[in-house]
Amino acid sequence: MLQIGPYTFQSRLLLGTGKYPNIDIQKEAVEASGAEILTFAVRRMNIFAPDQPNFLEKIDVTKYKLLPNTAGAKTAEEAVRIARLAKASGLCDMVKVEVIGCDQTLLPDPVETLKATEMLLEEGFIVLPYTSDDVVLAKRLQQLGCHAIMPGASPIGSGQGIINPLNIQFIIEQATVPVIIDAGIGGPADAALAMELGADGVLLNTAVASAKDPVKMAKAMKLAIEAGRLGYEAGRIPKKKYATASSPSEGMSIV
């Protein structure tokens, strides 16, 4: 099970709700994924306008934990304002802190992310900061008291998978809170690898929403994450330079 703050979840897949071809496919993909946490950009959704159609109208919100993100924020102050707006809707008490420092790479601003995380923790939010694969930054965020850390596998929407698995492993090894791999996942193999490395969960959006068949991809990601976690718990064999026979040679007759 995945434990974030006071909440417990069966699924280790967190699903984004943007970029889908239409709301019906979005709903089907959400159901196929088995995800219990759904994330959305507050700036792209008018949560105070019931007359505007959005995915919240199509799903049973009591079945999911909503995770608003502060996408679009460039400063800590902007991120805090967006988080407060989401909380005021009454739908959410968790927030994914996302403060972008570079428009081309969409990599997070480490200084502003730290500031926003500290400010929101002081206000009582359950905070999940999106960060790079910087091991020291991940440690600093945990020292502030965040409830999970979300290092990116590679740039948002790039589909490049885990570019630096060593840093991800370092982050996981020293983690005192759940590590959820966020951004850059392109296919099921990437998601499975994240879990095999020991991640507690994976957040996906583009890999599912922009797939040729989002519903099938959502199911594939669900299975990949489950398989990766099982593999991690089972313990893979070590890599070796030379072969090791799997069949015993003792007792074999020599002709």
From Swiss-Prot:
GO molecular function (one): thiazole synthase activity
Keywords: Cytoplasm, Schiff base, Thiamine biosynthesis, Transferase
GO cellular component term of the entry, any: cytoplasm
Pathway(s) it belongs to: Cofactor biosynthesis; thiamine diphosphate biosynthesis
Protein EC: 2.8.1.10
Transmembrane segments: none
UniProt keyword annotation of Cytoplasm present: yes
Chief place of localization: cytoplasm
Reaction equations catalysed: [ThiS sulfur-carrier protein]-C-terminal-Gly-aminoethanethioate + 2-iminoacetate + 1-deoxy-D-xylulose 5-phosphate = [ThiS sulfur-carrier protein]-C-terminal Gly-Gly + 2-[(2R,5Z)-2-carboxy-4-methylthiazol-5(2H)-ylidene]ethyl phosphate + 2 H2O + H(+)
Active site: 96
Pfam families, sorted: ThiG
GO annotation terms (biological process): thiamine diphosphate biosynthetic process
Enzyme type, top EC level: transferase
Annotated compartments: Cytoplasm
UniProt-annotated binding residues for 1-deoxy-D-xylulose 5-phosphate: 157, 183-184, 205-206
Description of how the protein assembles with itself and partners: Homotetramer. Forms heterodimers with either ThiH or ThiS.
PANTHER family, alphabetized: THIAZOLE SYNTHASE (PTHR34266:SF2)
Function as written in the Swiss-Prot or TrEMBL entry: Catalyzes the rearrangement of 1-deoxy-D-xylulose 5-phosphate (DXP) to produce the thiazole phosphate moiety of thiamine. Sulfur is provided by the thiocarboxylate moiety of the carrier protein ThiS. In vitro, sulfur can be provided by H(2)S.
Family from the record: Belongs to the ThiG family.
Name of the protein this chain belongs to: Thiazole synthase
Organism: Anoxybacillus flavithermus (strain DSM 21510 / WK1)
Gene coding for it: thiG
